[in-house]
Structure formats: C-alpha cells, structure tokens
Amino acid sequence: MKSIIKSLAIAAFAALAFSSCSQEQNPVSKDNGIHFTIRTSENPQVKSFIDNNLNGTYTPKWSKDDKLAIFIGTIDENTKPTATLTNISETGLTAYFDGQVTGIGKDGTFKSFAPAKAFATGYSNGNVGITLAETQKPSSLTIDQACDILVAKEASYMADATTGEVTIDDLYFKRMFSIVKVALKGPESLNEEIVSKFSLTAPERTILTGRAAINLSSATIDKWNISNNTVTATYTTDAPGFGGKYPDLDNVVWFVVNPGTIEPGAKVVFAGETANYTFTKEVTLSKALTFPESQLAV
C-alpha cells in the first residue's frame, strides 16, 4: 500500500468463501453434543489483523481466542448462534476453532462468521443482523478487529460414528466490509500531537456504519436496518500522531466501513482531537472515492 489519494487510501484484502467436509455417518446423541474442530485456510488474506512488516506489506493474522459464531438449522427473528467456537491457536496465519455443539443432528450444514460478538439479531427471512460499529477502537498499526466481519460460505459436516468428532479443514472466509487508511497531515503546529479521536463524515445518504442484514449463505449484504454516515476512531493507547518519524506507520488512522462509492463533487469531513487541539477539514472530491469490498485498492 503506497499511494494516498486525497489523504485517504483504501485497502481490503480478497478472500474466497468456499468450504466443505465429509466424515463417517454417525448416530451421535444430541445431548452429548458434537465436538467441532475447524481449521481455517492458510491463505494469509483470510483475516485482517494488520501487522506492518516495515516493507510496505501487511500480514493478516488470526489471534488466540477469536470467536466464530456458527448457525445450524433455520434462522429466524428468535435465532441466536447455535454455538460459538474459540480459536485455540496462538496468533498466526491459521486458526483452529474448537468447541462442543449440542442439540444438533449427526450431520448437516452450518453457516458461520467471525467475530461472533458482532451478532445482533436474526431475521424472519433467514438473514442475520451484524453490527459494524460507528465508534471503533483501532491502534496505530491496525484496524479494530471487532469490526472486520468475515463470512464463510455454508459448509457441510458429518460426525465420526465413534467419537462424535467433526474435523473441518481449510475453511475460507470473505471479508464483508472495506478498510480505510487515512494518513494524518497538517501544519507544523500539530507536529508531535497524538490523536485521541478522529472521524470521517460522508454525505447524508452514504452508509458507512450501522447494522447490516447479511445473507450468510451467499455472503452478501441484503440491506442496512440501521445506518450512519459517520465513523469515528478513538484511542487511549497506541495512537497515531502528526509528524511522526515513520510516515505511513505512526501517522495513520484505520477505519472499517461499508463498501460503496462517494461521487465526485461530494464533500467529506475529517475531524479530530489531540490533547491541545481540535481540528476539522472539509474536502470536495475531485473524483469518485470508492470503498471496495474484499479487494486491495491503493
């Protein structure tokens, strides 16, 4: 990622959304439950925990204790995740989601997404409501992971007849939203000022954050039931600042937003706070500003 357009560059990493598994037939007791172990693909584009490698590249990683929400059966307005599995691996390119699932049959299909805590509600048409927070908590080097929604395409499972174990390899995910990188630039008076809050406001009808109704089977956004045209980053530690020693490293604000396009001529507003200053800048776009879904843009 190396160019900045109107002080704003967008990055989103592609990830495929296909997975399947097959095991032996199994008359497993629903009370005893089925033990799931799901290994994610080793594709480094699966997860957007962005570690900067100091060479212009970024290595996406899963973190230990990441949570995967899985859904088995019909989804309606009363639905909650059938189970939540936990990554038992240390931080790395591959996650192993592990957990016991009760009340399900010996075989079937499941839908899933991470992180599980983004789940808000189910809908009668089979979609799930997933929250993309208006106020986010990134660090100086990475997005707020809680906002990076990754959906896996529906996968099949079949438990081992003796052990009740399900092992699934190479579960691939699709990123639902777009990552925005804003490089902080300002007058000399702001040099060495550390940002505590920074926001991006788009035109009124633009949707940046809110609650999306997502079809987990197709990994698509059906509609937004709650929508905001703003996104705000807040910091308590590990915050970016102005005039840092390492441009594009310690002077960067990261957001996660709804994919879309803001047309030429529209106005966007950047605003923020440091310990000593508040600042606002309105920018009129000379060309379209696009936040792409699941792809890399510079």
Predicted feature descriptions by range:
Residues 2-298:
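Sec-type signal peptide cleavage vicinity
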